[in-house]
From Swiss-Prot:
The gene is panC. GO terms for molecular function: ATP binding; pantoate-beta-alanine ligase activity. The keyword Nucleotidyltransferase does not apply. This is Pantothenate synthetase. Its EC number is 6.3.2.1. GO terms for cellular component: cytosol. The lineage of its organism: Bacteria, Pseudomonadati, Pseudomonadota, Betaproteobacteria, Rhodocyclales.
Length: 275
């Protein structure tokens, strides 16, 4: 695997590649990331992974400084997965001067759900991803469904800017007990890790209830929030939304997704499940 720390080096390698798939990450890789790499390998001649902890998407009281940075272990995992190139720039390479131009996603997409609780987050995500797409110029870009709202925002960005890039979603990879794999799971204490699968269990319960014909969505959401609170969680939201735009359902036959975000101790976990 070739490791590139500069835009010039990465672009030179890209020019020699055929059909390219890009998998952007912030590092601290787990099996969910590796599943995306393998999915990418099936859709392109060359897989390029990026690792960059993007300051722009972190709020002032979030975990930018303590976000796990495990570059050597990540390199070993990527090599084992057969990734051809790693783009691992430092902050001065990605932002040689303060970023003055940004991507502002449509307010209807980012004032809800995670955007309500993390103002500015999706602006930072969209800005760095557009920059990565311009640097790499991939044919395909892959993003995990665990970050469902992010996937929607980035898919819409690529479409509305008419970028010649196919956006592919990757299914959420879970531990045996159902917990969605996340780089932030490492923040959990042993007791919190034992409790954490409750979030997925509640999403499954909501999915099954809706499939069985229960359309009292507010009741389902409220009961699940109460269940989390009763077990020591601090939920931000549990919401049943349309898959297409993450707005509240209008018709009973709308394809739906249930999304959740909640704090367990000091760790904020997110998850979702299509219905």
């Amino acid at each position: 695997m070739q490791i590139h720390t500069t835009v010039a080096s990465l672009r030179a390698a890209r020019a020699r590649a055929g059909r390219v798939a890009l998998v952007p990450t912030m590092g601290n890789l787990h099996d969910g990331h590796i599943a995306l790499m393998r999915q990418a390998a099936g859709r392109a001649d060359c897989v390029i992974a990026s690792i960059f902890v993007n300051r722009l998407q972190f709020g002032p009281n979030e975990d930018f400084d303590k976000y796990p940075r495990t570059l050597q272990a990540d390199i070993e995992r990527l090599e084992a997965a057969g990734v051809a190139h790693l783009f691992a720039p430092d902050e001065s390479e990605m932002y040689p001067q303060p970023q003055r131009y940004h991507v502002d996603p449509a307010p209807a997409q980012v004032s809800i759900l995670d955007g309500e609780f993390r103002p500015g987050h999706f602006r930072g995500v969209a800005t760095v991803v557009l920059k990565l797409l311009n640097i790499v110029q991939p044919d395909v870009a892959l993003f995990g469904k665990k970050d469902y709202q992010q996937l929607m925002v980035l898919s819409n960005m690529v479409r509305e800017f008419a970028l010649p890039i196919e956006v592919l979603p990757g299914d959420t990879v879970r531990a045996d007990d159902g917990l969605a794999l996340s780089s932030r799971n490492g923040y959990l204490s042993a007791a919190e890790r034992a409790e954490a699968p409750r979030l997925y269990a509640l999403l499954c319960r909501i999915r099954d209830a809706v499939r069985a014909g229960d359309h009292d969505f507010l009741k389902l959401e409220t009961e699940a929030m109460a269940q989390l609170e009763a077990h020591g969680w601090a939920p931000d939201y549990i919401a049943i939304r349309r898959q297409a735009d993450l707005q509240p359902p209008v018709h009973a036959d709308d394809p739906l997704v249930v999304l959740a975000a909640a704090r367990l101790g000091r760790t904020r976990l997110i998850d979702n499940l299509e219905i």
